[in-house]
């Protein structure tokens, strides 16, 4: 039991008080010259330009600390002010610095994964670092029911902060994130849907920060699905070598099953061989299985309770639609048509 319980303990590396001191440290620019990060994609990544570099953030903070917040120039009277400064510029710059440093744990985990595997395709987009790639199998003939789960569920700002608390214990950093989210104008409308504007987690001016928050949210949301795929003896994973997040969350879910089964024995039989298939395509989680409608309905309510009680991810059963795969296979067909499959050459020799 102790072996399973240890997975509930957060990784010590992920619990370091790293974020807030680094942002306001005098020598934050040293991050831009770090050897480990430079040899990967943090510096050369698309979108990581001079506007969001650690050096620029350091200079910005130094400039803010030297200025008098009560002095407002007459030329800037029409500009929006935040603590006496240009709100749009300064809050955006600090949010960029927050994101750059917040991505360090994910990047370092990628570095350690590469050192073990020695070979990995170079990523040109930071979104893929902490976004779990969908599980894929080519054969769907054995599946008969599919559940569509619309994601992301409209996220409240506090739920976003609570999600980050699972791997970041630095209270100062969480307060800074909460301050940025609530102080920046119209950020609530980007996360909480309004009648005039649909829900969206991505901001054009602060896309990097919102992608980081969104992927952290989805990473928690999807953890249970990859556990189910690995549990199924009929659906071995075909693309799990470089997905270091899967190992981390798989340990957590496995421990939860072992510990929770003592208090809730009926839960254990759900995990024996779920025979499930999961993909994420166009904002939906598609979960297919060779099961009866009753079993799929049980899974629907179990997943909702699991997300709400253990991952602080709020969802509702009405957002999960169950259909027969024969009448609802368009999502799978569209997903497969957009994925480039690597054909393998098989050589055969006839025996005389």
UniProtKB/Swiss-Prot annotation:
Gene Ontology cellular-component annotations: chloroplast
Subcellular location, principal: plastid
Single Gene Ontology MF annotation: RNA binding
One GO biological process term: tRNA processing
InterPro entries linked to this entry: Maturase_MatK, Maturase_MatK_N
Source species, domain of life: Eukaryota
Membrane-traversing stretches: none
Subcellular location: Plastid, Chloroplast
Record keywords, A-Z: Chloroplast, mRNA processing, Plastid, RNA-binding, tRNA processing
Function statement: Usually encoded in the trnK tRNA gene intron. Probably assists in splicing its own and other chloroplast group II introns.
Family: Belongs to the intron maturase 2 family. MatK subfamily.
Protein's recorded name: Maturase K
Gene: matK
